[in-house]
């Protein structure tokens, strides 16, 4: 995405580290815009972005492996400060004439370094705890570099070429385990790259409105409303930018939460005076999904059918050229890049037909979920709408595991409504980042009254997170869980067992499909 010249930016190049998105987050938390891009990005593209600094992420490979990831060495001649992290430091060393070799043993975990009073470590104590994760080590630094930190296992825990403003650290400052990691990154971003830290949601709105108006001109836009927070924020942002040129199409695919369809029409159609067309397409989606149990196939079908519905509706309108979606930055990252295996196809990223008749507008595809909520508040959307539970584009279609039926949808819909009601009553809405129920499709034996039952199991998923990239299961009080379980088995037909998901992300994803 080409950024406006007046916006300061730190470019992060991706070498496949599990932590690379954390680098981007940490920088944004400092009020400086940052984007993650593939390491193969061209010099010309980098110049267009006009970054204030470049960070080379870590990665799982060795710089000497065949086909290992690399960059155009011209990056070091752009006159822009560069910080290499772990693999990024080793690659910098190799490309600029130093030596890297395989370590006798992998260094993983906490380590103590001794740092010099340098720009990168400005204002920090000499002795610091850092997080190491590497199997190669630098044994000779390039000409013009000096060591600015060492540890018992390496004389080159951090290096710098002060004249060219090129830096490297053998540890991960972006993770919480590194004691002064945020301070080190802040020193690079604010002191070395001279960023002012003025990136705010207010500024984002101004820049995005300008870009939307420039892209759209006097043409018309369709906004895909799913009922979730993301598409709702996109709709309000677009309406602020282009007013009546926007038509929102709310596809009621029969995969929504209880009462959601009516809520969308009331809150956004009437509350924001937006032009919303509600399309009842339940039968159409259910026909396409009949007999389909593979989660990837379900996502693709739902994504395709969404666009086909828009095609049908657009044909009834005149001069519509654009389709707007609520794609998030996490969607883009998780759908895979050259250095990351696809975890799952996101509805707003994969599943779009090649012959789609619209040009896409994705105004929040550089934002994380918490940033989207902040954007929603800045746009004037009421807090109770902004803090609604995250809801995937495929809706309950991926919370019914396996083949979707009307009966299974109703079970998930009713159990989810009970869960949300109890969480709200207990005042836990802000403490738990996301919570929902799933229907695994398995049956088990139970006893209700004097009768043996053989009915479905409901799974409860509740997690704490900041941005959805990583998460932990929520420690909900047992009495609250018991209340939820009791209500579900007593009030929802065909359910005799409730289980609680206690896995983190990773290794699991938040959604079950």
From Swiss-Prot:
Keywords: ATP-binding, Glutamine amidotransferase, GMP biosynthesis, Ligase, Nucleotide-binding, Purine biosynthesis
Gene Ontology terms for molecular function: ATP binding; GMP synthase activity
E.C. designation(s): 6.3.5.2
PROSITE patterns per UniProt: GATASE_TYPE_1, GMPS_ATP_PPASE
Domain GMPS ATP-PPase, first and last residues per copy: 199-388
Top-level taxonomic group: Bacteria
An annotated GO cellular component: cytosol
Active site feature: 86, 172, 174
Alphabetized InterPro entries for the sequence: Class_I_gatase-like, GATASE, GMP_synth_C, GMP_synth_GATase, GMP_synthase, GMPS_ATP_PPase_dom, Rossmann-like_a/b/a_fold
Positions contributing to ATP binding: 226-232
Pathway where this protein functions: Purine metabolism; GMP biosynthesis; GMP from XMP (L-Gln route): step 1/1
Domain Glutamine amidotransferase type-1: 9-198
Summary of the function given for this chain in its UniProt record: Catalyzes the synthesis of GMP from XMP.
Subunit structure of this chain's protein: Homodimer.
Annotated HAMAP family: GMP_synthase
Name of the protein in its database record: GMP synthase [glutamine-hydrolyzing]
